[in-house]
Amino acid sequence: MNSPEKKFITVEDPVEYRLPRINQVQVNAKIELTFGRVLRAALRQDPDIVLIGEMRDQETAEIGLRAALTGHLVLSTLHTNDALTSAMRLIDMGVEPFLVATALNAVLAQRLVRRVCENCMEDHQATARELVWLENLLGQSLSGRTFKRGTGCHHCHNSGYQGRVGVYELLEMDDLMIGALRRNDPQGFAEAAKLNAHYRPLAACALDYALAGVTSVEEVLKVCATLTDEGVE
């Protein structure tokens, strides 16, 4: 993506890393150099790729989405729990549903979970309550499955964990999801996403790592709890 043939402009607050071959602009509210103002100026430079540090308001979101309709690749971030709620969040910000449905191609959500320490790793059986909760959420049987956990050692400072790994949820728009967005139908959008063969929720990705012994069931439950606003006791 970052090649000499491509013109790449970023709008950030703040610019944290200097990147080669990329024109980076930092917004500054004190002099009214807002995301919207910088974006309008950036688009007049005919960029191939535009990175918006964050879509914080309706103006920024609308400019970014309209830029995507005119041949620019636009990348940005939103503060949401998962990929499903990201698309609807744009509409909640005041962007017209038809614009979101037309311009949005994909949403990638990500979280970090802790890795089980390999130096003190041991087998662990989840409680019946935890298994039922996960099975109901993910729709798959976990009976008889063994997980891993760390008992704590000097390598991990007795935490049982060492390092982190990313869990991801990629949502690529299809006709059913686009139709639900046009109707501003959150429930229909969620149902359409679940029918997409390529869609896997964050919790399922986290569970894959737990079943592979990379992370613990406790870390999976943390991810699930933030997605459902409830926990397991």
Residue ranges and their predicted role:
Residues M1-E233:
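Short, flexible helix-loop junctions that flank or precede catalytic/ligand sites
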